[in-house]
Amino acid sequence: MQDKSVREIKEIIETLEVEKYMEYIELLRVDERKSVQGLAIKLAKKLDNIRKEEERLETINIFENEGYDKGYLYIGGIDEAGRGPLAGPVVASVVVFKKDTKIEGVNDSKKLSEAKRDELFEVIKEEALDYGIGIVNNEEIDEFNILNATYMAMKKAINCLKKAPDYLLVDAATIPGIDISQNPIVKGDSKSISIAAASILAKVTRDSIMYQYDRVYPEYGFKSHKGYGTKEHYEAIEKYGITPIHRKSFLKNIL
């Protein structure tokens, strides 16, 4: 590599196949140029992250496979977004994949950048056997309370499916009033590919709704905080009052 410039080496690395990473890491490490040695360190970190992701993907179907082993055939993962905000809806999603589906990067939506969530949103919809999204607005949240509203959103999501699952993996909850076997999994959105995918669909859908509200009520900053109780949001409420999308039951102390 001594005969190549740093720029040329960077261009090679950008198109390098993963199988050749170790070979190039060793070559770059012995280069006398500090900048090239720095590229070796970056490439080694990238390889380490790839290996960690491969290891994670090997375990992310465990709960789905347990369901198949029990004889279930159509397994869905379900999760919600928006239980905590002061404004806007709560959104739930359910996703059904074929057995042993693996999608690189699918994880708890809170651990992903917005750009990555948006990218995976499209991939998940393409890869899923089926998916459903349920939305419950702020007025229903005030009427039924947030927990019941969350269950309502989940049931709406299930009802959007072409075919009901015979087994549901749920993120740390059991949905009442449905005749489907369920497995509540603590931190399921980082342990099950189906729940993780559902968390991404729910989050991206809700964020999209809040972006629309931001155009209607630009002074509240919904685009940035998505309705959560930030300092900016509370200051806007104090200055302008509440909007029709605010959850009054969440604002009893200041109304």
Curated annotation (Swiss-Prot):
**SUPFAM superfamilies with a match to the protein in the record:** Ribonuclease H-like
> Any binding details for the cofactor?
Manganese or magnesium. Binds 1 divalent metal ion per monomer in the absence of substrate. May bind a second metal ion after substrate binding.
Any single Pfam family the record assigns to this protein? RNase_HII
* Entry-linked InterPro entries: RNase_HII, RNase_HII/HIII, RNase_HII/HIII_dom, RNaseH-like_sf, RNaseH_sf
Q: Name one GO biological process term.
A: DNA replication, removal of RNA primer
Keywords attached to this entry: Cytoplasm, Endonuclease, Hydrolase, Manganese, Metal-binding, Nuclease
Question: Nucleus as a keyword?
Answer: no
- Chain sites annotated for binding a divalent metal cation: 79-80, 171
Q: Report whether Metal-binding shows up as a keyword of the record.
A: yes
What GO CC annotations are associated with the protein? cytoplasm; ribonuclease H2 complex
Which coenzymes or cofactors are required? Mn(2+); Mg(2+)
The main enzyme category here is hydrolase
Gene Ontology molecular function: manganese ion binding; RNA binding; RNA-DNA hybrid ribonuclease activity
In short, the EC number is: 3.1.26.4
Compartments annotated for it: namely: Cytoplasm
Q: Which CDD domains match?
A: RNase_HII_bacteria_HII_like
Q: What reaction(s) does this enzyme catalyze? A: Endonucleolytic cleavage to 5'-phosphomonoester
For the RNase H type-2 domain, which residue ranges apply? 73-255
Family indicated by similarity: Belongs to the RNase HII family.
Q: What does this protein do?
A: Endonuclease that specifically degrades the RNA of RNA-DNA hybrids.
Q: What is this protein called?
A: Ribonuclease HII
What is the organism field in this record?
Answer: Clostridioides difficile (strain 630) (Peptoclostridium difficile)
Give the organism's phylogenetic lineage: Bacteria, Bacillati, Bacillota, Clostridia, Peptostreptococcales
